[in-house]
């Protein structure tokens, strides 16, 4: 079960965080529990979604000035 969890964690880190192998291995070595890991992933996604929304809002605001 623990080994499955490690593989699951690696898979999600590779899929959701497009980062190089060294960073992935350092995150895997943190030995987070499932709860902590899920909280971290949710936090990362909230930040990504907020930054995306903010970026799009800024683009539309800037485009609005030129209309």
Curated annotation (Swiss-Prot):
Disulfide-bonded cysteines: none
Listed Pfam families: DUF2649
Membrane topology: Multi-pass membrane protein
Ranges annotated as spanning the membrane: 10-30, 40-60
GO CC, alphabetical: host cell membrane; membrane
Record carries keyword ATP-binding: no
Cell location: Host membrane
Keywords of this entry: Host membrane, Membrane, Transmembrane, Transmembrane helix
Main location: host cell
Family (UniProt): Belongs to the plectrovirus ORF10 family.
Descriptive protein name: Uncharacterized protein ORF10
């Amino acid at each position: 079960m623990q080994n499955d969890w490690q593989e699951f964690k690696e898979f999600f880190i590779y899929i959701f965080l497009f980062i190089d192998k060294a960073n992935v291995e350092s995150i895997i070595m943190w030995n987070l529990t499932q709860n902590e890991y899920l909280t971290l992933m949710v936090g990362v996604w909230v930040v990504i979604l907020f930054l995306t929304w903010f970026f799009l809002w800024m683009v539309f605001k800037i485009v609005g000035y030129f209309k």
